[in-house]
A protein has these predicted regions:
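Mid-domain Rossmann-like dinucleotide-binding core that forms the NAD(H)/NADP(H) cofactor-binding site
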Residues: 1-43
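N-terminal Rossmann-fold cofactor-binding loop
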Residues: 21-23, 56, 106
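Short, acidic/turn-prone active-site loops that include or flank metal/cofactor-
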Residues: 24-26, 42-46, 80-84, 107-108
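A short acidic, Gly/Pro-enriched loop at the edge of an enzyme's catalytic core
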Residues: 45-53
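N-terminal Rossmann-like NAD(P) cofactor-binding module of classical short-chain dehydrogenase/reductase
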Residues: 53-54, 77
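Short conserved AdoMet
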Residues: 58, 71-72, 150, 154
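Glycine-rich phosphate-binding loop and adjacent beta-alpha segment
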Residues: 60-122, 161
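C-terminal hydrophobic helical "lid"/dimerization subdomain
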Residues: 110, 114-161
């Protein structure tokens, strides 16, 4: 969900080309609905270099491969690594000679939350955010909601009080 939201946000902020890498067919198609200009099944199929790469997967293998896609003065933003994961190998010379900037993002401040709310108020109707919640359950059906989420792997499930 973060990757799709970031895709939509980047497009509203004037990004000229947003490329999304997603192994899942359905989620790749959703990326187009959220403004992606290009989609790819895997990192290896991407041609060229990028000014910025944002990782929402948290996959160590994806991070190692994606960092090589950065152009000189590129920025790599790690968002999806919020749990312990395997260590990655970085080439310090590549980072230094190419003036690569690494940024880690975790949590948010109140002004970040306000900016997100403003984005949804101003641009939310341009993108199918409601479709990200695939099914809704009442709180008394919480076990069914968890089973559904584990079995179907939806982007989001809603549980109502």
């Amino acid at each position: 969900m973060l990757g799709l939201t970031a895709t939509a946000y980047l497009k509203t902020q004037g990004a000229t080309c947003v490329t999304v890498v997603e192994p899942d067919n359905k989620r790749r198609e959703q990326a187009l609905d959220f403004g992606a200009d290009e989609i790819a099944m895997d990192i290896q199929s991407l041609p060229g270099k990028f000014d910025a790469v944002l990782d929402f997967s948290g996959s160590s293998a994806a991070i190692e491969a994606a960092i090589q896609l950065l152009d000189i003065h590129g920025t790599f933003v790690l968002v999806g690594t919020v749990a312990p994961s395997p260590a990655i190998s970085l080439d310090p010379e590549f980072l230094v000679r190419n003036l690569i900037q690494l940024v880690g993002v975790h949590n948010y401040r109140p002004d970040d939350l306000q900016a997100a709310i403003s984005f949804l108020e101003e641009s939310g109707s341009q993108f199918p955010f409601r479709e990200l919640v695939e099914k809704s359950f009442s709180l008394v059906d919480i076990n069914e909601a968890v089973d559904f989420a584990l079995r179907e792997k939806p982007i989001r499930v809603m549980v109502r009080p």
